[in-house]
Amino acid sequence: MLRLDEVGRHYGDHQVLHDISLTVPDGQLLCVVGPSGCGKSTLLRTIGGLLPGYEGTITLDGTPVRGVPDDLAVVFQDYARSLYPWLTVRENVVLPLRRRDLPRAERRAEADRILARVGLTDAARRHPWQLSGGMQQRVAIARALVCRPSLLLMDEPFGSLDAQTREDLEDLLLEVHRTDGATIVFVTHDIDESVYLGDRVVVLSPGPGAEIVLDLPVELPGPRDQITTRGLTEFVALRSEVGRAVRNR
């Protein structure tokens, strides 16, 4: 379980986050939305131990977060810069496993397993620069999942992709979440995406000193799909509620 108690952050005299308190149960997919520049990414990096020096407390399974937890993985929006262009797709995915005492053949088998999950078996020997943007982001997701993290942080991972590729990866994420059950904190500026993906949506207020202004459970029938789910009356109502909170109306 991930827990935040009265978490805040300052940069000098500038307050970015104020009194953020959350409890995220194991296996929940939590979406965080808010106006541009309100501190969503700062919150995500603080949760992941990437930005030390915060106020309040953050615990993961009861252990205070004072650095990057071992069972954490992060997927960023800028997939092209997060992959090593001189390594093959398989070598990029294997990279996190090198910290573990596993035989080389087992590391390769794990990488191939997750590449199959994300539909990239045929691309294993290619290099990232030979792939489309959507395929590169699939590689980044595969690399994050290969160590079977208990907490996955995703910072607007689909924000720079075209609409069709974005929908494909949203559905891939839902499938992975159903089968793997990791706790996911997903930052997005897209209101529709937050409602489509999330078990719960949290809305941050505009800065400075962003606070939680809405904490909304998302109860939609499953399995979700792009056509049926987005056409549901419940979906439209939830989207409107989140939209009003984001726009402070």
Model-derived segments and spans:
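The feature captures the beta-strand-to-loop junction immediately N-terminal to the Walker
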Residues: 33-35
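Helix-to-loop junction immediately C-terminal to a conserved catalytic motif
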Residues: 48
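Conserved ABC transporter NBD signature motif
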Residues: 55-68, 110
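Short coil-to-helix segment of the ABC ATPase nucleotide-binding domain corresponding to the Q-loop/switch region
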Residues: 86-95
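Conserved ABC ATPase "signature" region
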Residues: 94, 105-123, 175
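Conserved ABC ATPase signature
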Residues: 127-131, 135
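A short, proline-enriched helix->beta-strand linker immediately N-terminal to the Walker B motif
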Residues: 146-150
